[in-house]
Amino acid sequence: MTAMPSFAVVTDGGLDAYPTLLNDVPVAPFSVAFGERSYPMNEVSRQWLYDELGRNPAHPTSSQPSPQQWLDAYAAVPSGTDILAVTISSGLSGSRNAAAQARDLAGRQVTLHDSMTLSAAQAFQVHAANVAAQRGESMETAIAWMNAVQAETELQFTIETLEYLRRGGRIGTVAAALGGLLNLKPVVMVDKKTGTYVNAGRARSYRGGIEAVTSQVTRKYGEGTPLRVGLLYGTHPEDADQALEQLAARHPIVWSDRTGVNPVLSVHVGPRALGVAAAPGAWPWER
């Protein structure tokens, strides 16, 4: 007999959801803007963004969910149900602050949890929270599981060009020019303590960047360690296939899935990117 859910989970647009995880929850969307026009991410597709990047001279910007958008996400939860709001890292966005403002206005019992990460790694935590809710576990147990998932999950990515990081002000003009001249591809990870991007290495080619990402996963967990792997791709799904093939040659893969990078995150990494969220073996509740 399945327990009644003990609370409901909501999240924000930092999430890259996987169909084989419990990621189908109300979302407070980020927005993408080209010049004066702003579009909530739930109203545009990845392909639309890639088309705009190719034809629109304006560089897009992204913006966090507003308190009203968080209120709308809370309102999607049936009245009387407590809410666990899982946010993108506060080191990367002010979404958590907007969620807190909305909580003060909602008249609901809302608990905030800073994932200290984003994207596929955020999806792992949302899944953990939903498993706890569906099993009738307490919110404290859900948070403990999310903290365990956060501690053991590594999120890394590489990109084909530094141009979009440069345009967005996340890398200097000189660094971008030098990287382009030498064809250097960064390997970026999310620091667990600060929840911010840190440089984890570089490669001389995009294919080399993919190999660098998967090699760092193996160095982290040790060859032969069973892994759960969430893969991310931009315009080329085959990049995810290549990364999985490399990891599967060195690890038993106990779960894997792939999904496209959402439009808002694509603003910063550009059309072609590869990301990997990896964690060892079983989920916390399976041990």
Swiss-Prot record:
GO molecular function, one term: lipid binding
Top-level division of the source organism's lineage: Bacteria
List of residues binding hexadecanoate: S62, S93
InterPro entries: DegV, DegV_C, DegV_domain_contain
Keywords (A to Z) from UniProt: Lipid-binding
Leader peptide range in chain numbering: none
Domain DegV: from-to ranges: 7-280
Pfam families reported for this sequence: DegV (PF02645)
Known role: May bind long-chain fatty acids, such as palmitate, and may play a role in lipid transport or fatty acid metabolism.
Record's protein name: DegV domain-containing protein DR_0500
Source organism phylogeny: Bacteria, Thermotogati, Deinococcota, Deinococci, Deinococcales
